[in-house]
From Swiss-Prot:
Protein's UniProt keywords contain Metal-binding: no
Record InterPro entries: DapH, DapH_N, Hexapep, Hexapep_transf_CS, Trans_hexapeptide_repeat, Trimer_LpxA-like_sf
Family: Belongs to the transferase hexapeptide repeat family. DapH subfamily.
Any GO BP: diaminopimelate biosynthetic process
Pathway info: Amino-acid biosynthesis; L-lysine biosynthesis via DAP pathway; LL-2,6-diaminopimelate from (S)-tetrahydrodipicolinate (acetylase route): step 1/3
SUPFAM superfamilies (alphabetical): Trimeric LpxA-like enzymes (SSF51161)
Keyword Transferase set for record: yes
HAMAP family associated with the record: DapH (MF_01691)
Main EC class the enzyme belongs to: transferase
Protein name (database record): 2,3,4,5-tetrahydropyridine-2,6-dicarboxylate N-acetyltransferase
Pfam families, per the entry: DapH_N (PF08503), Hexapep (PF00132), Hexapep_2 (PF14602)
Signal peptide: none
The entry's keywords: Acyltransferase, Amino-acid biosynthesis, Diaminopimelate biosynthesis, Lysine biosynthesis, Repeat, Transferase
Length: 240
């Protein structure tokens, strides 16, 4: 998987068309109203639903106010630079409420749980789970077969563009409510205890805990048993 360069992300945001998409429920004498091709109009003579840019739909509503009895607007963003990721072709389990921006890489059989937030440029490896309410900032990278616990934060780095992003290597377990600061690498097979604040690189196959996090021991069989990654949670339906 390719990590986006910070300057690529900055350029994408700068050049993107800022959008305020809306969904509008409308009723009235709609046979008298003409809708442009740039607005998706699913209407009959008396009612319907519109999808499009707010500035354009507002103009339609204002210019046809004598024909429109009532309308309700649904709107969840304003001048948004980054669309949501199109999830339909992704071979992963993504639960309702996850917020995933465009230009995020998600490996096969990954799991993204409810209300996780994943920003532009983040990378999630095959078979990794991002648990409820976890946050992956811009360009944060998670390797294969990892678990990022509920409420954990992997700090994002888009500006300054020279800053190094968070990198979590393969087979890492990060506990609930952990904070990993910018520039930190968590080494392969490491375990970060719940609530830790990680300010420095974590050596491979070690357990760290505390604020700031410190190595408390090397991985042993007991730790492996307590932090086992269950592949059964990552299985998808067979393709048809």
């Amino acid at each position: 998987m390719k990590m986006m360069d910070a300057n690529e992300i900055i350029s994408f945001i700068q050049k993107s068309e800022k959008k305020t998409p809306v969904k509008v429920y409308i009723k009235g004498n709609l046979k008298e109203v003409t809708f442009p091709e740039t607005v998706q109009a699913f209407v009959n003579k008396k009612s319907g639903v519109l999808f499009g840019e707010w500035s354009e739909i507002k103009t339609i509503l204002d210019e046809n106010s004598k024909y429109i009895v009532d309308y309700v607007v649904e709107n969840d963003r304003r001048n948004s630079a980054i669309p949501m990721l199109d999830l339909k072709g992704i071979k992963a389990r993504i639960e309702p409420g996850a917020i995933i921006r465009d230009h995020v890489e998600i490996g096969d059989n990954a799991v993204i749980m409810m209300n996780a937030t994943i920003n532009i440029g983040a990378v999630i490896g095959e078979g990794s789970m991002i648990d409820m309410n976890a946050v992956l900032g811009g360009r944060a990278t998670v390797g294969k077969n990892c678990h990022v616990g509920a409420g954990a934060v992997l700090a994002g780095v888009i500006e300054p563009p020279s800053a190094k992003p968070v990198i979590v290597e393969d087979d890492v377990v990060i506990g609930a409510n952990v904070v990993v600061l910018e520039g930190v690498t968590v080494g392969k097979g490491a375990v970060v205890a719940a609530g830790a604040v990680v300010t420095e690189d974590v050596p491979p196959y070690t357990v760290v805990a505390g604020t700031p996090a410190r190595v408390i021991k090397e991985i042993d069989e007991k730790t492996k048993a307590k932090t086992e990654i269950k592949q059964e949670l990552r299985q998808l339906n067979p393709e048809k």
